Amino acid sequence: MKNHATRNPPRLGRSALAALLCLLCLAAPALAADFPLAVTDAKGRQVSVPRRPQRLVVLSGNAADALRILRATDLATGVTERIRENPVYWGSLAALPSVGKWNSPNLEAIAALRPDLVIGYGANPGPELEERLAPLGIPVLRLDLHRLHSLEAEMADLGRILGREAEASAYLEWHRAALARIRDLVGRAGTRPRAYVEGYSDFRVAGPGSGIDEMVRAAGCLNLAETMAIPFAEVTPEWVVAAAPQIVIKAVSGQRSYECADPGLLPRVRERILARPGWSLTPAARDGRVLVIASDLCPGTGAAAGVAHLAAFAHPEVAGRIDPGAVQREYLTRFLGLADQGCYVFAGARP
C-alpha cells in the first residue's frame, strides 16, 4: 500500500495557527533590527549604535525637527535651553528637562537622564562630549541635518536607527521631488544670476561648505564666493561692489520666526543692506534685488522650502511656476504638524 501521509500533512487547528502567527509577530521586530548598527556621522566617522534607542537627548534643533518628521518625539527625554525657550514652535519638546546650551551642554544633566543616544551637530560641542560620555556607555551621534549633500543620508540613517523607515522614506520622497522640480525649472531658465550671499555677520560671505551655499546653487545662482577655500570669509565693501552682484541674499540667525515675534526684523535688515555706502553702484541694489531669509527655515530639514523661495526670487521668469508658499506649507503642516505661519523671507513685500 502507498503511504499517503506525505501528501496529506496534518492541519494546524485555529488555536495553534493563531499562536504561531503571534510568535512570528513578536519575532518580527527582532528580525528587522540589525543592531549594533554602524552609521557614518557628520565627521565621516563610523559610529556604532548598540541598540534601538528609547531615550534620546537632543542637542540640535535640526535633530529635533527630524524627530517630528519621523514621528519620534516621544523618545526625547532632554533638550537644550534654546528649544525650551520657544514653546510656540517646539510644543511638548519645550517642556522636557534642560541639558544646557546646544554647544556646551551640562554633561552631568545629560548623564542623569540616562539616555541611550545623544544627538548633536558635527562641530559643536567639542570632542569632550564623547570623552566624558563614552565611559558611561552613552553613544553620541553627530548629524548636521542642514547640508543638502548629506541631509538625505542622515535622515535615512536616523529613520533606520529609530525604526521609522517609512516616515523617513515619505519625507525623502517629498524632499527629492520638490528639489528636482525646482532644479528642472531653473535649469530651463538658462541664466545663473551672480549672487552675493552673506551669513549672519556683516560682510561675512558664505562660500563652499556652508549650508546656504548649497541651497543657493540648487536655486540656480552663481555664488560669487564659490572659489573661496573656506565656508565663511570676511570681505570688504569694495570687494562686493567690484563683484557687481545681480542679487543679494542675506541669512539672518533664528529669531523665533514661526511665531513672527518681530515682524519688522527682516525688513529692517534689508533696509540696512540697501543703505550701505557705495552699494547703490551694484546692480542688485539699483534693482532692489535683495532677499533676507531666516535660518529657522533653512538650511535644515526645511531646505526644499528655502530653495523654492530662493529660486522664485532669483528667477522671475519662472517664478510663476514655483510656489514657495505651497512647499513651505506642506513642510510645516504635513511633516512638522504645525500651522502654516511665520516670517521667514522678505524681499520687499510684506514678510
Q: Predicted regions span which residues?
A:
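Alpha-helical, coiled-coil/dimerization segments enriched in small aliphatic residues
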Residues: 85, 210-232
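N-terminal secretory signal peptides that target proteins for export/translocation
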Residues: 1-11
